[in-house]
Structure formats: structure tokens, C-alpha cells
Design a protein with these regions (language model features):
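Terminal beta-strand-rich extracellular "head" domains
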Residues: 17-24, 28-98, 102-144
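Extracellular/luminal regions of secreted and cell-surface proteins that mediate adhesion/ECM remodeling
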Residues: 1-18
Length: 144
């Protein structure tokens, strides 16, 4: 993954069609992940291709919108730990058209970084600590 590039995470998306344009959409989920040592993984959610992560706007023209940041092996305690990062927020799509929510990642330190989803970096078979995991995104309409 190239530094500061927004990349969609395959399989972590959904569509919902609000019945009224005044209704809200509650979006929640979690990401199971591991990344290279001394690297940073930032996660975001987009609506119809636009990053709508609910934490702070970009400042100074160079920061990305992201809802969580994780340090590489400093945070993961090694290349065998799978971290689980939850997210949740209320969105106001203001439409009755189909809306697609997509989870993505931004790597933040150097180019050629690796981010593993639902597994560890090492991913060694037959050990008691290299687990496989799942990630999830769920949304439901809330009357507004």
C-alpha cells in the first residue's frame, strides 16, 4: 500500500436504501488487523466513494480523515497479534437512493507497507497464537 493512499478493504462494504430522505443510518462494525512493524494503519468509512469518517476534518490540507490509528508492532505487540478495532457512528445520507458504505485503510509511514485483515502478519499454521479472525460492517435505518 502506498503511503497516505485511501484503499478499500475487500469484502467490507454494504448497501442500504433509506425509505425517507430524513432518516438516519447507524453504521457500526469492527476490523481485525495487523500491520508491518513501525508502520501505522488508519481506518475510514466512505459513503458512495467519499470518505465520511466522523472524526475531525483534515487540517492544513495534508491530514486524512480517519476514525482510528494503530501503530505497527509497537501496538500489536509482535507480528502474531490480531487487533480488533470497533467503529460506530450515525450518518445522514439525506436520500432515498441506494447508499454504499465501504471500510478502507490509509497507511501512514512509508511506501510498500502491508496491512493484514483477519489474520496476523506471521500467520503460522499449527500454533496456538496465530489466529484467523473476521471483520464486519452493519448498518440500519433510524427514523429521523
Amino acid at each position: 500500500v502506498t503511503q497516505n493512499q485511501e484503499v478499500n478493504i475487500t469484502g467490507l462494504s454494504l448497501t442500504i436504501k433509506p425509505s425517507r430522505s430524513s432518516n438516519l443510518v447507524w453504521v457500526q462494525g469492527f476490523i481485525s488487523h495487523n500491520c508491518d512493524s513501525n508502520q501505522q494503519a488508519h481506518f475510514f468509512v466512505s459513503r458512495n466513494g467519499t470518505n465520511i469518517s466522523p472524526i475531525g476534518d483534515a487540517g492544513g490540507g495534508n491530514q486524512k480523515r480517519a476514525f482510528v490509528s494503530a501503530q505497527g508492532n509497537q501496538d500489536y505487540m509482535g507480528n502474531w497479534v490480531v487487533k480488533n478495532t470497533p467503529f460506530w457512528f450515525m450518518d445522514t445520507p439525506a436520500t432515498t437512493s441506494t447508499v454504499t458504505y465501504q471500510v478502507g485503510a490509509i497507511m501512514g509511514v512509508t511506501n510498500s507497507q502491508y496491512l493484514w485483515i483477519n489474520r496476523s502478519q506471521r500467520d503460522t499454521s499449527g500454533t496456538g497464537y496465530d489466529m484467523r479472525a473476521v471483520s464486519n460492517i452493519t448498518a440500519w435505518e433510524v427514523s429521523g
